Amino acid sequence: MKAEIIAVGTEILTGQIVNTNAQFLSEKLAEIGVDVYFQTAVGDNEVRLLSLLEIASQRSSLVILTGGLGPTEDDLTKQTLAKFLGKALVFDPQAQEKLDIFFALRPDYARTPNNERQAQIVEGAIPLPNETGLAVGGKLEVDGVTYVVLPGPPSELKPMVLNQLLPKLMTGSKLYSRVLRFFGIGESQLVTILADLIDNQIDPTLAPYAKTGEVTLRLSTKASSQEEANQALDILENQILDCQTFEGISLRDFCYGYGEETSLASIVVEELKRQGKTIAAAESLTAGLFQATVANFSGVSSIFKGGFVTYSLEEKSRMLDIPAKNLEEHGVVSEFTAQKMAEQARSKTQSDFGISLTGVAGPDSLEGHPVGTVFIGLAQEQGTEVIKVNIGGRSRADVRHIAVMHAFNLVRKALLSD
């Protein structure tokens, strides 16, 4: 089924509102195996909407119109669709009854003739009741094309889609997806490694998405059940993770989790809780961003003892008891400083792990180091590891954000090795 979404409303074209309905509809239709091929916005103009309906009817088998179902003169979606199809508008008894109740409970409200328009549907349409508003939706098929009209306000559209429309559109198969999350490998390298799988995909499919500091892969398949989908997705996932980088490193080493909402931080926090271990941090360039990210999750008092924000050399010396002369000798952006910061954070809080971040966020270089140079230390009972990462060509905010991601990934690897 080829679907098309037409958003009706001049306010969309003038930028007064954002068309979030199209995104919601596309997502929900994809979940039931309906492919959206076109999205269009048109103003409150009958001539232009008629022209668009003519085009849509030739190229799509499902045409969904959103907005323009209200009581005012510029709400003309149903009227225009009826004219296009050569049909009349008729009243839906259930919608009329809802109007009666609405105004009976509000005697101070004037019930004018234009209010009645909200209870009308195109002749022959199946009514789609409005759970949170007054304007009834509708669905009808003419000459092999299914037309759907939905209200514009998201608070009315969403329940109508979820509870009324989708059950009527459901077929034998649905779209099932799985998201793999990768850190430490760029999108271009990942796409190059997976070129054969991407070029030859039919079903299941995979699509890469680059985000700040990480890459996600969405694996999708159409199936009649979750079990059937899992079989296909498991095969594709293993094909992906069995691939290697140009250096011979398995992609399994870069895949840290699954799902839209998962993050490196959430993985680390949950694993610390599971293992009953604690962590503390000492931060310079990130100025507490690592600690703030940890604190975003509930129940972290059991694993997060506290930390230090030591932005200046003087505070690194004073708060962490690192001799100032040593800091001056090695520099604040150095392996030595990262090591000592991590060790002192761990020691002073009696934590299992001490993590440190020191580097150059930009826009200016520091101590001869270019912007994006970051040293990250991780102290634990077995010893201290320091890594150097280069996050060049990024904004100051991105350098700090990605540095924190590297820190979480370092902790994640340590937890997995225990």
From Swiss-Prot:
<dbReference type="InterPro" id="IPR041424">
    <property type="entry name" value="CinA_KH"/>
</dbReference>
<dbReference type="InterPro" id="IPR036425">
    <property type="entry name" value="MoaB/Mog-like_dom_sf"/>
</dbReference>
<dbReference type="InterPro" id="IPR008136">
    <property type="entry name" value="CinA_C"/>
</dbReference>
<comment type="similarity">
    <text>Belongs to the CinA family.</text>
</comment>
<dbReference type="InterPro" id="IPR001453">
    <property type="entry name" value="MoaB/Mog_dom"/>
</dbReference>
<dbReference type="InterPro" id="IPR050101">
    <property type="entry name" value="CinA"/>
</dbReference>
<dbReference type="InterPro" id="IPR036653">
    <property type="entry name" value="CinA-like_C"/>
</dbReference>
<dbReference type="Pfam" id="PF18146">
    <property type="entry name" value="CinA_KH"/>
</dbReference>
<dbReference type="Pfam" id="PF00994">
    <property type="entry name" value="MoCF_biosynth"/>
</dbReference>
<dbReference type="InterPro" id="IPR008135">
    <property type="entry name" value="Competence-induced_CinA"/>
</dbReference>
<protein>
    <recommendedName>
        <fullName>Putative competence-damage inducible protein</fullName>
    </recommendedName>
</protein>
<dbReference type="Pfam" id="PF02464">
    <property type="entry name" value="CinA"/>
</dbReference>
